[in-house]
């Protein structure tokens, strides 16, 4: 009887541990942190105590930080030096680093994939070498600074290609060769252990779009093969398309895993605390979630459950929860933050990372 009494609490403790840590990567993109601090922002925890943002995140269950990397931005924001500085703080706080290489001097997304200044726009052979050398340089720089990198995404939301015009979707062989070169920039770097290599597309709920891209690059006859990358990342935003249901996301993630054999992650997502005038109708199976701090927790938990219940589903990252000078985060919703932009104080929704 005594043995059973001892084992029962241990079993309950083990179950609680498994329930609260089902995702290997429980992350946030805080790329804007150094810019916000330069503007005088001083972050506070939920109790109103001033603390570095990375410490606040860690205390709330975040274990990984996503950082966007631009090649040669005009003001230095998000360049390599910027990201090394940020990553040192992330490492010191005990979280892993995930680098999101945009291969651009500015934002890269489905509508913008501008080739960096000085990179070739008319010769794919030259461009692929530039991609390889740049990717290797980034990774080598992190290695020389003693910073391990868990994940490197080779491009950001590249459903419509990358490094335009050579990497436009009218030439999937070019896209495939660019991705192959980027992957080997990571593989040939001095980082040890080697980071996982990710390909990242937007509209993660749209299985047909995901399938079309991967089938196109993998059957293009170019150099990219499945062994070049380890992870598939998707963006999942609820406020851009009423078709972006959790049900559709579930189908897409499961199909991505079963078709291509890669672990899958939702690497960008948000939920509003205020959205009085949405530009699009919200998906039908999300309409019961309120636009509130409590609603943020519910939404993240539901998305995390979709990921966790997908074979090979290993992570979720919230996009820019603390960018207090940009509360809308590019959407038609007024406020998608987990930090109150009026007070710079963490909202209680941030604690959701300790539950997923």
Swiss-Prot record:
Family the UniProt entry places it in: Belongs to the glycosyl hydrolase 53 family.
Principal location: secreted
Name of the molecule in the record: Probable arabinogalactan endo-beta-1,4-galactanase A
Sites where a glycan is attached: 133
GO molecular function: arabinogalactan endo-1,4-beta-galactosidase activity; glucosidase activity
Top-level enzyme category: hydrolase
InterPro entries per the UniProt record, alphabetical: Glyco_hydro_53, Glycoside_hydrolase_SF
GO biological process, one term: cell wall organization
Keyword annotations of the record: Carbohydrate metabolism, Cell wall biogenesis/degradation, Glycoprotein, Glycosidase, Hydrolase, Polysaccharide degradation, Secreted, Signal
Leader peptide range in chain numbering: 1-21
The reaction(s) this protein catalyses: The enzyme specifically hydrolyzes (1->4)-beta-D-galactosidic linkages in type I arabinogalactans
Protein species of origin: Neosartorya fischeri (strain ATCC 1020 / DSM 3700 / CBS 544.65 / FGSC A1164 / JCM 1740 / NRRL 181 / WB 181) (Aspergillus fischerianus)
């Amino acid at each position: 009887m005594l043995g059973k009494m001892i084992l029962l609490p241990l079993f309950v403790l083990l179950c609680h541990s498994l329930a609260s840590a089902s995702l290997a990567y429980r992350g946030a993109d805080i790329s804007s942190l150094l810019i916000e601090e330069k503007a005088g922002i001083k972050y506070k925890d939920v109790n109103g105590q001033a603390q570095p943002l990375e410490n606040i995140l860690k205390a709330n269950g975040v274990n990984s930080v996503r950082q966007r990397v631009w090649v040669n931005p005009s003001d230095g924001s998000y360049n390599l030096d910027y990201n090394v500085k940020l990553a040192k703080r992330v490492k010191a706080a005990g979280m892993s680093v995930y680098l999101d290489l945009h291969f651009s001097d500015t934002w890269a997304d489905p509508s913008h994939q501008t080739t960096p200044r000085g990179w070739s726009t008319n010769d794919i052979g030259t461009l692929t070498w530039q991609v390889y050398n740049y990717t290797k340089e980034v990774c080598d720089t992190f290695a020389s600074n003693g910073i391990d990198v868990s994940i490197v995404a080779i491009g950001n939301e590249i459903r419509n290609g990358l490094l335009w015009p050579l990497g436009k979707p009218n030439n999937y062989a070019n896209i495939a060769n660019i991705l192959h070169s980027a992957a080997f920039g990571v593989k040939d770097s001095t980082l040890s252990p080697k980071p996982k290599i990710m390909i990242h597309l937007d509209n993660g709920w749209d299985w047909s779009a995901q399938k079309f891209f991967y089938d196109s690059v993998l059957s293009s006859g170019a150099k990219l093969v499945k062994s070049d990358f380890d992870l598939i990342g998707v963006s999942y935003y609820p406020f851009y398309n009423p078709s972006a249901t959790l049900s559709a996301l579930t189908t897409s993630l499961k199909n991505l895993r079963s078709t291509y054999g890669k672990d899958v992650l939702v690497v960008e997502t948000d939920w509003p605390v205020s959205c009085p005038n949405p530009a699009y109708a919200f998906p039908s199976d999300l309409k019961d979630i309120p636009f509130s701090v409590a609603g943020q927790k519910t939404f993240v938990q539901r998305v995390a459950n979709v990921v966790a219940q997908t074979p090979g589903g290993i992570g979720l990252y919230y996009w820019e929860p603390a960018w207090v000078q940009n509360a809308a985060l590019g959407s038609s919703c007024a406020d998608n933050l987990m930090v109150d932009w009026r007070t710079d104080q963490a909202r209680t929704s941030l604690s959701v990372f300790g539950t997923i």
